[in-house]
Amino acid sequence: MKTLKTILTLFTISIFAVSCSSDDDNKPEPIKYNEENPLDAYMAGSGFSQKAVDVKNSGIYEYGFSFKPTVTGKINALIVKIPDVNSTLRITLWDAATKTVIKSEVVNVATANVTVEKAITPIALTKDKEYFFTVNSDDWINRTKTDGSAATYPIVAGNITITGYAYISSTAAETIFPTNARNTYYAGDMTFKFQQTE
């Protein structure tokens, strides 16, 4: 009888030990958010999805859009589509407040009018901080509304709020912050994959 009592006691202790250790194993896994590409929502919200004209070899410009993430996150990839071949297309992310370059990447556009995606080392973005995303090129897709009217900024595109569009005349070697704001067109196409991290 004493042996049976000892066995039951050991059995009870082992059940408690297993149940306590399994509590530690049930920690929730961190949430993994889906990647977002803000371009389609930007084009729809601005109306610039209505008309597109290819522009080739039309002088070199640094052009793009400013934006603020509404959540903390990161850029995981760059996406571009232009109407000409360019093996050294430079895409740049700027700090909009200081007008300084955060990161530049070169993308090889081997075929005209084909979307190219380049995975990059993730670039962390701070919630509500304004950034500028530009490309340096003499080719672009000029997107407008059919009636030529202006878009109203800001434009919400998921967790990214587009705050404006601008350009500046440049050279292939220069990286110059765009200061000529426009709201009647968008030259592109360039965008990124954004992923919320918290």
State what each model feature region is:
Residues S21-L93, W140-E198:
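Beta-sheet-rich sandwich/jelly-roll-like modules and their strand-loop junctions
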Residues F16-S19:
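C-terminal motif of bacterial Sec signal peptides marking the signal peptidase cleavage site
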Residues M1-L8:
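Bacterial N-terminal signal peptides that target proteins for export
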Residues K5, Q50-D54, S58-Y63, K103-A110, ...:
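Sparse, context-dependent recognition of short Cys/His-centered cofactor- or disulfide-binding micro-motifs
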Residues L10-I13:
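Short, linear, compositionally biased motifs with a strong N-terminal bias
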Residues S87-I162:
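Aromatic- and Gly/Pro-enriched, solvent-exposed loop/edge beta-strand patches characteristic
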